[in-house]
Regions:
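A residue-level detector for the "anchor" residue at the start of short, highly conserved motifs
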Residues: 1-159
Length: 159
């Protein structure tokens, strides 16, 4: 069983030793060992992440380096580099409950996420894009409603 991903997913997989389950992206392969986890792996982003809610997964990058992560850990892959840190898993998978949550993310990363969810484009000067943001918002059908509740002014262009 193999799943190829370009985007963001959350999966709950039952343990079946006779039928291994793998998730592959352009930078990594995740061997699932019976678990609940999230993956963020967009082809146009430098970093890809695996965050583990329950169970365990073994992550291998394209160079063959591998590491097992435990619940409440996030593994980031950037080409040959792999970094593990302890995290609040909900920061990474809150979108499955209809909540977009950000903790100490650059404004540019927040705008990139909003752009993907709402299919609109956000342009932001580089110096402003580096500002760190924290917060959350309920995912609504219309991006203008979300943006009207914020302090920033945006110009919205349909894709």
């Amino acid at each position: 069983r193999v799943l190829y991903v370009n985007g963001e997913i959350y999966i709950e997989v039952a343990k079946h030793p006779q039928w291994p389950f793998y998730v592959k992206t352009n930078q990594m392969e995740v061997q699932v060992l019976g678990t609940s986890f999230g993956i963020t792996a967009y082809d146009d982003e430098i970093f890809q992440t695996v965050v583990l809610k329950e169970g365990s997964v073994f992550v291998k990058n394209n160079q063959g380096n591998g590491q097992t992560i435990q619940p409440n850990q996030c593994l980031m892959v950037e080409k040959e580099e792999m970094t593990v840190k302890d995290v609040d898993v909900y920061d990474y998978i809150s979108w499955i409950d209809g909540v977009l949550q950000f903790h100490e993310k650059s404004l540019q990363k927040v705008l990139n996420s909003l752009s993907r969810y709402y299919r609109v484009r956000f342009d932001c000067p580089m110096e402003i894009g580096q500002i760190k943001c924290s917060g959350n918002c309920k995912r609504l059908r219309d991006a203008t409603i979300v943006l009207q509740t914020r302090v920033f002014s945006f110009v919205i262009k349909k894709r």
